[in-house]
Amino acid sequence: MRSVSYVQRVALEFSGSLFPHAICLGDVDNDTLNELVVGDTSGKVSVYKNDDSRPWLTCSCQGMLTCVGVGDVCNKGKNLLVAVSAEGWFHLFDLTPAKVLDASGHHETLIGEEQRPVFKQHIPANTKVMLISDIDGDGCRELVVGYTDRVVRAFRWEELGEGPEHLTGQLVSLKKWMLEGQVDSLSVTLGPLGLPELMVSQPGCAYAILLCTWKKDTGSPPASEGPMDGSRETPAARDVVLHQTSGRIHNKNVSTHLTGNIKQGHGTESSGSGLFALCTLDGTLKLMEEMEEADKLLWSVQVDHQLFALEKLDVTGNGHEEVVACAWDGQTYIIDHNRTVVRFQVDENIRAFCAGLYACKEGRNSPCLVYVTFNQKIYVYWEVQLERMESTNLVKLLETKPEYHSLLQELGVDPDDLPVTRALLHQTLYHPD
């Protein structure tokens, strides 16, 4: 296991308190460049753009925000900012600016103004984690919410009017699932049949597949305030398929996180992937592949840190996403599909973490690691890239180049004679005279 040091960092100002899932990266203004979204317990959403230490704009919400997200939740072809509070308030913000630009090229209509939601609705309270994704394979995105009482609910936006621009619909409830353990993560991965599958983490390095068994041709009741009763939301045990990833579990109650659809190359960008990863608070990391008969364990790693967040990020640029896990003390592990481990240390305690693409510098998205600390700062490490994950040396690199062998032959040195070639390289580098 080798250590790396990333030095390209910007510090953002953030004075609030936040829940672990109230942070995300996404394109909130639909300009193809990602922003950083952070929601706090006072109901304020801060949107950071580029390397500016202060928020580009803020949004006002009702209640303590537990999760934020960015996506085309209304299936209108553009991203919206979604913020959900513990009290059950669901907020939608349309931050796509007007087409009028000021002299500097910025969107003058948004900067400095506190944004109000374009839509607000009450859903069941005690929200914990949120996912915006197509979970049933119909090509439309759904909203999935995990709750503190071990319940997961799926919603869909239902349009009531004809206008393509204005939001004239509401969230409707699709299904409710009841889990045995606490839900800490929601994700989607590609199932054996090529269709998306909704996954939720379960304690003890376990997970469950939630079956989407609703009928698409029937209406759904609105996600109204208060309890939502009715046959369509009756939790059914047969719609929750629990998977234990290990026969020997050290702590069956340990908190578990997961991330799915881990890319295996540029060719799988659109088709998805059946790879998924899990991590636990007691330091277990696993990469698995979902198969038709039984899940396949690709590797398992045990570390001596408490892992509280799990992400995926392509740090080598080859289309293969690495698994990124963060501990409370700032220790970050980056592991590739071959179990090669690289670690990175942030010298502060961390209360929230996310990873992804962010347009910090140079007007383009780059791989970033985002850490929320306890000292009113958010650290964004940008351009987080490695030439390769595995360790190597100069001789191995030179052996891949044809001109290296021809130069050795001109000097009368056998390329297979390692002691002689190492001595020659040492003399060339350190004693050229």
Curated annotation (Swiss-Prot):
One GO cellular component term noted in the UniProt record for this chain: KICSTOR complex
Function: As part of the KICSTOR complex functions in the amino acid-sensing branch of the TORC1 signaling pathway. Recruits, in an amino acid-independent manner, the GATOR1 complex to the lysosomal membranes and allows its interaction with GATOR2 and the RAG GTPases. Functions upstream of the RAG GTPases and is required to negatively regulate mTORC1 signaling in absence of amino acids. In absence of the KICSTOR complex mTORC1 is constitutively localized to the lysosome and activated. The KICSTOR complex is also probably involved in the regulation of mTORC1 by glucose.
Subunit structure: Part of the KICSTOR complex composed of KPTN, ITFG2, KICS2 and SZT2. SZT2 probably serves as a link between the other three proteins in the KICSTOR complex and may mediate the direct interaction with the GATOR complex via GATOR1. The KICSTOR complex interacts directly with the GATOR1 complex and most probably indirectly with the GATOR2 complex in an amino acid-independent manner.
Gene3D superfamilies assigned: Integrin alpha, N-terminal (2.130.10.130)
Protein name: KICSTOR complex protein ITFG2
PANTHER family xref list: INTEGRIN ALPHA REPEAT DOMAIN-CONTAINING, KICSTOR COMPLEX PROTEIN ITFG2
Gene: ITFG2
Residue positions, PTM Phosphoserine: 104, 220
Keyword Membrane among UniProt keywords: yes
Organism: Pongo abelii (Sumatran orangutan)
